[in-house]
């Protein structure tokens, strides 16, 4: 005789298992962003930043003579231009872009794409028969991370525990300089001594550079608030679901009402790629 199910217990149905198995074998072509935004080597970083900010994207493919040759990202903008003391108008994309492109095929399974992303440390350009078909980012991957055994790993084993923070009244210029030198994509913003918001590379692009605003504004005025957090001990699959549903790429982790770390989309991809 079959044992009765305990109250509250849930068992995956055949459809659930089939769907999970289907997601494990998704191809790059199933999840890639096919609308690729391009720029040229001669474009100023000021214009490139405005394009990224207006489109709410973190990178542009660089095309020369009709051929994709490189990529320029929000991290290039932060670390090589702003933190490096360069002028946005005087600096061209060619001076800071990353090349060659990291190329993958559209029929590659997403876990292999994740492994390539972590190994090569960058966004992936999808090519078919020599033609650019799309781009894959960490955000694309976490939206499709399947509920498989490898995604039951805990965020605590992959998160960054050394949190960097700034007071809400700190000028953005100072925060950006710190982020660039530490090569991090976000900083926790505190108000009255308590974590209140988060300032990210995307906030810099969309809230400031896309509008032509200066960097002397207080960081607390353009940070993302309220602060979205998750409890310590959740799986990377659960963290990925939160990020995807909230449209965020960085998730602070809390334990007993205290922040103990932060997990990023790239951290989740690294865990999934193992």
Predicted regions and their residues:
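Tandem CBS (Cystathionine beta-synthase) repeat/Bateman regulatory domains
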Residues: 1-274
């Amino acid at each position: 005789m079959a044992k009765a199910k305990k109250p509250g217990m849930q068992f995956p149905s055949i459809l659930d298992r089939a769907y999970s198995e289907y997601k494990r074998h998704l191809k790059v072509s199933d999840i890639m962003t096919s609308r690729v935004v391009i720029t040229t080597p001669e474009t100023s970083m000021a214009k490139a930043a405005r394009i990224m900010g207006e489109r709410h994207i973190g990178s542009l493919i660089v095309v020369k003579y009709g051929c994709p040759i490189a990529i320029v990202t929000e991290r290039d903008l932060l670390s090589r231009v702003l933190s490096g003391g360069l002028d946005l108008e005087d600096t061209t994309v060619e001076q800071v872009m990353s090349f060659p492109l990291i190329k993958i095929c559209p029929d590659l399974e997403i876990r292999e794409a994740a492994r390539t992303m972590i190994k090569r440390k960058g966004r992936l350009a999808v090519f078919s028969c020599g033609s650019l078909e799309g781009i894959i980012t960490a955000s694309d991957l976490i939206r499709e991370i399947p509920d498989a055994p490898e995604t039951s790993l805990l965020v605590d084993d992959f998160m960054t525990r050394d949190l960097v923070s700034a007071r809400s009244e700190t000028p953005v210029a100072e925060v950006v300089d710190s982020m660039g030198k530490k090569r991090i994509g976000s900083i926790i913003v505190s108000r009255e001594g308590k974590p209140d918001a988060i300032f990210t590379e995307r906030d810099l692009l969309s809230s400031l550079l896309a509008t032509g605003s200066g960097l002397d504004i207080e960081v607390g005025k353009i940070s993302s608030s309220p602060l979205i957090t998750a409890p310590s001990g959740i799986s990377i699959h659960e963290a990925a679901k939160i990020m995807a549903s909230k449209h965020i790429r960085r998730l602070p982790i809390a334990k007993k009402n205290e922040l103990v770390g932060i997990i990023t989309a790239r951290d989740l991809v690294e865990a999934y790629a193992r």
